Amino acid sequence: MASRTTIGLAHCYLGHGGGEVATLWAIQALKDEYDVTLITAGDVDLTELNRFCGTCLREGDFRVRQAPVPAWLRRMRGAQALRSALHQRHCRRLAGEFDVLASGYDPCNFGRRAVQFIADLGWDPQLRGTYFAEDEGRLGSLPGRLTRTAYHTLCRALTQRSGWNTFRGDDILVANSAWMAAVIRTRWPSSRVEVLYPPVAFRSGPLPWEQKEVGFVCLGRIAPEKRVDAVIQILSQVRARGHAVHLHVIGPMDGSPYSTRIERLCRANADWIQVEGMKAGLDKERILTAHRFAVHGWAGEPFGIAVAEMAKAGCLPFVPEVGGAAEIVGCPELCYHDASDAVTKIEAVLKSDALQEELREKVRRSACLFGSDVYTAGVRRIVGLLGASTSARRDREWALAR
């Protein structure tokens, strides 16, 4: 019997985010046809990952190869760039062992062609400066330009350049929205880009509209780029206009300076804001389905899997007009360009039952694009494009010979 094609799938650190959901579902998509190995620098708690991502993977469905990263560094908040450098160097050392290579979260320079599933834009300094807000608690953002420069110079040195150009058109870059694909093509005109929306595994059916609370949810990591403080300010202004709405903030309060500030802000408005903390699975779905509306704050987020979850739950999510989240809702009435515009559009929807009904149908149709079946079929198709390449075997032989 012929041996199965081997694939090395890299993800530096599996936490609780959209990149993890996409990576776990990629393994789910590939495990029956490929011999899959996950290359990571962090721990793998499969029970927790299945619970968070909605997958049903078992021990034995894939192998795990861990990069030799010290335990203290694996758990250190804010050391993403350093962990990534050590992880990427390890991936390049292992590259020759696999027929096909893929990165589940942002580009990984394996020194040969690969499929690059890109979850955000924070890995590129130019794009990070445009679309990301920095937290003063991150190691990569310590005070002082010289300190930051020295830190990132160290990380680049540890990565060890391979001479391979990921953006010249040999690698397949998989963007999670048409918006992000356009950003990548503008930044790297020679790159080869495919668009594949991430999966949303939502098991609960939406409640009837009349049974939902006239309130809002805000879902996701409590991080500066998510702009949870802006969401609170928007809804505070909506309340000032006479609408007695409330807010549930769902996301892990991890003790970072930003999350501490958000906790204080929520406590100061405890009469209408409830902090739910980290929620997953049915616990999260119960809160989402019980509410009519949602607000998302990150302008320039490539996709926004939290927004897709809220849409699947039957919410009407208000999102920034810049970024992939606007593709999820598909309605200009739900997309805002600044806080004032958000307040105006929220109030218009709150005042009109007819508009709510019209938008609900549009969002419902749009949410159908984000099923796990659509995603897994797309993963198999895109990985197959690389695996079927006549030069894929030569790439592996070249990597082994280095």
Language-model region placement:
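Conserved donor-binding/catalytic core segment of Leloir-type glycosyltransferases
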Residues: 174, 206-226, 232-235, 248
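A charged, aromatic-enriched C-terminal amphipathic alpha-helix characteristic of glycosyltransferases
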Residues: 353-400
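A conserved mid-protein helix/loop that constitutes part of the nucleotide-sugar donor-binding site
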Residues: 21-25, 223-237, 257-260
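Membrane-proximal helix-turn-helix segments that form the acceptor-binding/catalytic region
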Residues: 137-173, 181-182, 186
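Nucleotide-activated donor-binding/catalytic signature segment of Leloir-type glycosyltransferases, i.e.
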Residues: 251, 259-279
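Aromatic "clamp/platform" in nucleotide-sugar-dependent glycosyltransferases that forms part
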Residues: 299
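Short hydrophobic beta-strand element within catalytic cores of glycosyltransferases
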Residues: 315-319
